[in-house]
Amino acid sequence: MAHKKAGGSTRNGRDSEGKRLGVKRFGGEKVLAGTIIVRQRGTKFHPGVNVGCGKDHTLFALSHGKVKFEVKGTKNRSFVSIETE
């Protein structure tokens, strides 16, 4: 004989995994060519000098140097550049 009544069903109880987006290398950090700087959805940060943009809008270093974040333009866009030494 059951000691508990049957539990009801629910339509909740699931969620997607986090996608690990965000800034991976911060301003002033030294990076090598190919290092991922930002993983993002859309272009929250735009590629500047010596920075490439992947098909999923990932920004990566095209040369060795220091990461530099700057806001410029009339639309106040954030750009990521690499200053070579």
Curated annotation (Swiss-Prot):
Gene3D superfamilies: 2.40.50.100. One of its GO terms (cellular component) is cytosolic large ribosomal subunit. One of its GO terms (molecular function) is structural constituent of ribosome. It holds the Pfam family Ribosomal_L27. The keyword Ribosomal protein applies. Keywords: Ribonucleoprotein, Ribosomal protein. Residues 1-21 are annotated as: Disordered. The keyword Ribosomal protein applies. It comes from the Bacteria. GO terms for biological process: translation. InterPro entries: Ribosomal_bL27, Ribosomal_bL27_CS. Belongs to the bacterial ribosomal protein bL27 family. This is Large ribosomal subunit protein bL27.
